[in-house]
Structure formats: C-alpha cells, structure tokens
Amino acid sequence: MRLSPVFVALLSGLLAADLGLARSVAPRVADSPAAVTGTRKTSLLKNVAGLPPVPSAAQVAATSLNTDDIQGDILVGMHKQKQLFYFFAINDPATFKTHLASDIAPVVASVTQLSNVATQPLVALNIAFSNTGLLALGVTDNLGDSLFANGQAKDATSFKESTSSWVPQFAGTGIHGVIILASDTTDLIDQQVASIESTFGSSISKLYSLSASIRPGNEAGHEMFGFLDGIAQPAINGFNTPLPGQNIVDAGVIITGATNDPITRPSWAVGGSFLAFRQLEQLVPEFNKYLLDNAPAGSGSLQARADLLGARMVGRWKSGAPIDLTPTADDPALGADAQRNNNFTYSHAGFDLGSDQSHCPFSAHIRKTRPRADLGGSLTPPNLSAGANSIMRSGIPYGPEVTSAESASNTTTQERGLAFVAYQAQLSQGFHFLQQTWADNANFPPGKTPATVGLDPIIGQNNGQPRVVNGLLPSNSSASLSIPQFVVSHGGEYFFSPPISAIGGRLSA
C-alpha cells in the first residue's frame, strides 16, 4: 500500500509528539498552489568531500533549537545544487499578506525538512525581507540592528566601495524582499517561479533575479577561482557535531534570540537571522594571468609557482588543503579530509607567531577572516577566539565556466562570481565586521612584524585602487605586491530571514 504524502506528514507529527520530539510549529504539508509538488527520491543538497556535511536528521532530532521554525538555508550551508535569488517589491501589501499567510508560509522549507531526503520538497523555498519590506508590511518593530535598518547601500562607504559598479536595483532601498529557491534542476526552479508569480499576481513586482549553480564535475564545492569553499563554517554548540579545528559558537551568534544573543528581540523575531547578500563578480582570467606574471622565483614549473602564489593569497591550495599545514605543495588528500583540513591554528613550535610567514602569510584571506591564534586564543584546536564574529555562509557560484577564448585572451567577457550569502544574529559583528575591521584593515592581524600586513588579497577593498599586500612571496616576506581588484562588488542588500511562524503570523497580520 502506498501512503499519501499528507498521511505520512500527519503520522510523523503524531509520532514525534508521542516521543516528546514535537516543536512549537505543527507539521506542514505542501498543499499550497504556490508549491511545486511531488515526491523527491534524491537529495536536493550535495555533500562535498572536505566540507562540513549537511546537518543530519539525528542532529535535528537531538537539538534544543526549534528547527521546525528556522528557515532551512540559515543552517544548511553551502550545499545547494541549483539556486535562484528572486528580488521583489511589494505593490499591494494587503493582497501580498493574504497570499504570504495562506500560500507561502505553509511551504517555506525548514531546517528539519531539509535534513532528511524523505521530507525535502522538490524546490526548497525561503523568504527574507529588507527593512523597507517590513515597513511596507506595517512592521515597525525595532529588530536591534541599525545596519539592517539603514540598508546595505548606505553601508557601501564603510567597505571603501562605490555603488557605481552595483546592480542598479541594489543601489537604494527599493528591494523589499528576496525569495530563495533551491533544487537540483533549473526546470523545477522555473516551475516554482511561475507558481509564485501566479499566486502573488500584481501584488509584487520582480525587480531582479540571479541564477546560481554548483560548479560541474570535480569543481563541485569550489568557487570560480578554483578553491574549495566553505571549509571553515562554524559549528553551532548543541546542534552540529564539531569537526577537528572547527570554530564552536553559541546559537545566538547566528540565530536571533537564541543562546547568548545579547540583543533583546521582539518575540516574533526569535528564531530568525540577518542575511547579508552580495553579488561578487570574479575576474578569473585576469586573476590567473596575474598569478603567472607574479609567480615567485624558485624551482618548479611556472604554473606550479603561480599556484603557490594563489595558495598564499587564499591560505589554501585549490584542493582545500591549508598552506599552514602543507606550505610548499598541494596535498589533495588533506584537502578532501574534513577531519584534518581545518585542524590548525597558525602556531608552530619553534616559530614566532608574530613574525613567521613561512607557513601562511598574515594577509592570507582565510587568516584575515578567521585569525585563530593571532587573537590570543588557544594554540590548540578548536580555537574559540573571535567566535562572536562568525558567520554561517550559504553562498553559491553564479555564471558560466571560463571559456577557452577568455583564457586565451586573459580577459573576462561573461560575468561569473559568487552569490555571497551570510547569516548572523548581528550584522555589526558578522559580515560587516569581517569586511571592514579585518579584510579592509592593512594592520590586521595586530602585533605582527612588520606591523603593516596589507589588505585581504581576495576581498579587501580600497576604493577601486590597487591593494598593497605584504608577505605573499615565500622567499621575501617583507616584499609587497600591488594587487588589482579581482573580486568586484555589484552590491547587495541586508535582509531579515524571519522564523517560519512569523511569516504566517506577525508579517501577515
């Protein structure tokens, strides 16, 4: 006998309640006209060797977090295969609220649903709102985040960034929200978009959209420059099973109103997270040419020496192997091993942490954005320093692979890059802090010799001017390089990803 999905969902809810596992939000079934319905046989998420795995159903069952009420993208991380970011404006708040409550809230994918293939939808739908979007809905509550309230365009100067290169729709506060769709095929996402647009009708207008996809074949999990991305995700205390060297943070660092969130939130906003979205173009052919032109002297082929320079700029080889553990040559087996590839602190016996750059430059991207022992934390993993400045990354590459013509001319002709997504409970301690206080700060990490470290060679910004970076050449750590901007921001927005109960509750009232 074949049981219907509705019966299975109801039976699961009854069993969970009987076992004491029920959360505050009742099981939901995808009977909304806004949903693309069907039975999923394979996961819409992809585990990649070397990255922290997708949260399991067992972890979800054991946690005290209300994972039925937390939108799935917040804690799933960088595991989506296909994704669409649909940015919209609200034209008719009353009609929008009606459909938000009746058609969208019932099908928003939770962490619980995404942890098990049996409960995953064909298309995972999440939704988040800008401050102007909340105001359009009549929600004036103070969420306790001034950066969110002001919007990302007003924050651009903090990052030494001009909005002249931004997508026009981001250069203001006109975007009210973003619907995030994830699946394993573009066709399913297209069907979901058609359903959403039919449901909302003229109550919303699409302002902009960005399609994104995991890279093909062996490049799955790698960003457009070719480096395995997302290894250093934090582990949430009481939810994730920490990997060796993984930063362990309280849930309140990522989830509003959770353990050790220092800000008092409106009751309806407990269980949400602030979403920083950035469209970051990557000039891959130009980046590769720069590495060849500036490859350090030494033995080995020109390409091998160029790869070494790239690894020292990032802090990892393309495989994900950290140069702090393998400073002169890639070790793909290490890169693919999540039990080893994050288990380091930058401290080495017999080497001075304040002056040694033979293992890893002070300016390397991953050292700038997670300094480990540089901030005086434990010299033994896991290093808990800077836990309050952790973010949960959930981005994905966008755009086509580099063409042979682009490689031959060393010139980008088709846009590609990273749809950067970061979740945190405080933007001022998360994304904003990492970019402004660490990546864009030439004197960070502190207490080093020489004191001027230089900007983050990957994401550091200098108002469009060349960035001076020190310590990248292994034979001369005092030498500096002037590095063009190979990651170009096309802007973004700050959103609040509310708890699911608020989507059909406070935001629809």
UniProtKB/Swiss-Prot annotation:
Active-site feature positions: D229 (proton acceptor)
> Per the record, what are the reactions this protein catalyses?
Reactive Blue 5 + 2 H2O2 = 2,2'-disulfonyl azobenzene + 3-[(4-amino-6-chloro-1,3,5-triazin-2-yl)amino]benzenesulfonate + phthalate + 2 H2O + 2 H(+); 2 a phenolic donor + H2O2 = 2 a phenolic radical donor + 2 H2O
- Where heme binds, per the record, is at H365
UniProt propeptide residues:
23-61
Matches recorded under SUPFAM superfamilies: Dimeric alpha+beta barrel
* Signal peptide feature range: 1-22
Q: Where is this chain glycosylated? A: N343, N383, N410, N476
Name under which the protein is recorded: Dye-decolorizing peroxidase AauDyP1
Question: What is the originating organism of this protein?
Answer: Auricularia auricula-judae
The gene name on file is dyp1
